[in-house]
Amino acid sequence: MNSSLQRLEKKIGYQFKDESFLKLALTHRSANGTHNERLEFLGDSILSFVVADDLYHRFPKVDEGDMSRMRATLVRGHTLAELGREFQLGDYLYLGPGELKSGGFRRDSILADAVEAIIGAIYLDSDTETVRGIILSWYNTRLESIEPGVSQKDPKTRLQEYLQGRRKPLPTYTVTKIKGEAHNQEFTIECIVAGLDKPVIGKGSSRRKAEQSAADIALGQLN
């Protein structure tokens, strides 16, 4: 195996017996030939099961609704993309020229899909218990810190519920600035919230993320 992939193996905590599984997991459909989408499908199902099983045993008194919300938080694309960045996965992806040029190695969806594909690849290269152990090692900190209840709602939802519960008007979000090229933009949002003297400013790589950032800051100031 080449030294580059060996470095990645150390980061993910698994050494492949068959290098071709890892290479396939890192190959986006924009690259010519076979790509990682079948592995992604497999990995998505495995991840969902492993996380659901852990939550079931970790929280014996929590109902189905809260467990579903916790699982959704843990397996959503944003969380998977965070894992991908922790592994510096963008440095190892095989992308077509168009995706390379547009910064695909930084895109949340591509990183998240590759993480799921790696899970599928590890399963095919090993067995159920091995892939379970790898997933739980990746998620250890997140599983230790997650709690049932309101924390699983996103900041915009929590801010809205906070204001509604106090019979206050809903916040308004306005884009005040968009910086950068189309594939690598930064949005600045101004959020006006009843009860706060000044508008709250949030920034993010999309309008939605900037709004969530502003809502999170507003909640911190209100509480």
Swiss-Prot record:
EC number(s) stated in the UniProt entry for this protein: 3.1.26.3
Cofactor(s) of this protein: Mg(2+)
InterPro entries membership: dsRBD_dom (IPR014720), RNase_III (IPR011907), RNase_III_dom (IPR000999), RNase_III_sf (IPR036389)
Subcellular localization: Cytoplasm
Any single biological process term in GO: mRNA processing
Single annotated GO MF: rRNA binding
Annotated RNase III domain residues: 5-127
Domain of life: Bacteria
Keyword line: Cytoplasm, Endonuclease, Hydrolase, Magnesium, Metal-binding, mRNA processing, Nuclease, RNA-binding, rRNA processing, rRNA-binding, tRNA processing
DRBM domain location: 154-223
SUPFAM superfamilies xref list: dsRNA-binding domain-like, RNase III domain-like
One Pfam short name: Ribonucleas_3_3
Residues annotated as the enzyme's active site: D44, E116
Binding site for Mg(2+): E40, D113, E116
An annotated GO cellular component: cytoplasm
Substrates-to-products reaction catalysed: Endonucleolytic cleavage to 5'-phosphomonoester
Chain's role: Digests double-stranded RNA. Involved in the processing of primary rRNA transcript to yield the immediate precursors to the large and small rRNAs (23S and 16S). Processes some mRNAs, and tRNAs when they are encoded in the rRNA operon. Processes pre-crRNA and tracrRNA of type II CRISPR loci if present in the organism.
Subunit relationships: Homodimer.
Family designation: Belongs to the ribonuclease III family.
Protein name (database record): Ribonuclease 3
Species per Swiss-Prot/TrEMBL record: Aliivibrio fischeri (strain ATCC 700601 / ES114)
Lineage: Bacteria, Pseudomonadati, Pseudomonadota, Gammaproteobacteria, Vibrionales
